[in-house]
From Swiss-Prot:
First-listed, main subcellular location of the protein, grouped into a coarse class: cytoplasm
Family assignment from sequence similarity: Belongs to the EF-Ts family.
Entry GO terms, CC: cytoplasm
Region annotated Involved in Mg(2+) ion dislocation from EF-Tu, chain positions: 79-82
Record carries keyword Protein biosynthesis: yes
Compartments in which it is found: Cytoplasm
Domain of life assignment: Bacteria
Single GO molecular function: translation elongation factor activity
Keywords: Cytoplasm, Elongation factor, Protein biosynthesis
Name of the protein this chain belongs to: Elongation factor Ts
Gene Ontology annotations of biological process type: translational elongation
Length: 280
């Protein structure tokens, strides 16, 4: 069967692959488009396997909100250029829609979207990974995305505007816990040990150092907890004080940022990373 321009166009539309790749696949199968698609899918799987070792520390945080629940999903790629690609963004949206609909675990989402991920890796040429999914449930919810890289959901009993401002605060100030009382005892003990050591290095006796540290520990638990932090929009008051004034409460929050905890490859410029991603 002759390989016509119309056949190449159809294969491009069905696979999203480049024109030359489609033409080559059709020539190899004597114009059998179904066999060409099958071969291209196998080739895509091979490409995805080769890309799997590449560090994917860029990407996007997506948020989808439903009745009393919100889903946050992190999908990673290798470069911020691909993070803005319409195909990548569409994939991340599909994953997040599925997460909200089923409250699936990250492992379940990875299994559900593996075929689509492999096809996207073959098309884009970068490793892609569904890394995290988290859910927040509450009476009232507010969401905030700072660009594509930071996503926050806050749940509580308050008007949406107040919760939205708190979500913006969480994005900027990175609290680790909800209240000072929520800071785990082992975290407090470790920080106390560090602060006592600092005071003793300043020449204080251990007894005096331990007394000094009491004030520092109160400051520490405030700094790492949402309600104890100075509110970014009104720094003379804490978030807890602002909430009390409004008769509002926050029951939970989640903040995700692209690439948290991923060790990036050092020593390469962006151009070098792109060149490396394009090899093989």
């Amino acid at each position: 069967m002759a390989v016509t321009a119309a056949l190449v166009k159809e294969l491009r539309e069905r696979t999203g692959a480049g024109m030359m790749e489609c033409k080559k696949a059709l020539v190899e199968t004597n114009g059998d488009i179904e066999l060409a698609i099958e071969n291209m899918r196998k080739s895509g799987a091979a490409k995805a396997a080769k890309k799997a070792g590449n560090i994917a520390a860029e990407g996007t945080i997506m948020i989808k909100e439903g009745e009393g629940i919100a889903a946050l999903v992190e999908v990673n790629c290798q470069t911020d250029f691909v993070a803005k690609d319409s195909n990548f963004v569409a994939f991340a949206n599909q994953v997040t829609d599925a997460a909200l609909a089923s409250k699936a675990s990250v492992e379940e989402l990875q299994a559900q979207f593996e075929e689509a991920r492999v096809a996207l890796v073959a098309k884009i040429g970068e490793n892609i990974n569904i890394r995290r999914v988290q859910y927040v449930e509450g009476e009232a919810l507010a969401t905030y995305r700072h660009g594509d890289r930071i996503g926050v959901v806050v749940a509580g009993s308050a008007d949406v505007e107040t919760l939205k401002h708190v979500a913006m605060h969480v994005a900027a100030s990175r609290p680790e816990f909800l209240t000072p009382d929520d800071v785990p005892a082992e975290v407090v003990a470790k920080e106390r040990e560090v602060q006592v050591g600092i005071a003793m290095n300043e020449g204080k006796s251990k007894e005096i150092a331990e007394k000094m540290v009491e004030g520092r520990m109160k400051k520490f638990t405030g700094e790492v907890s949402l309600t104890g932090q100075p509110f970014v929009m009104e720094p003379k008051k804490t978030v807890g004080e602002i909430l009390a004034e409004k008769g509002a409460t926050v029951s939970a929050f989640i903040r995700l940022e692209v690439g948290e905890g991923i060790e990036k490859q050092e020593g390469l410029s962006f151009a070098e990373e792109v060149a490396l991603a394009q090899k093989g």
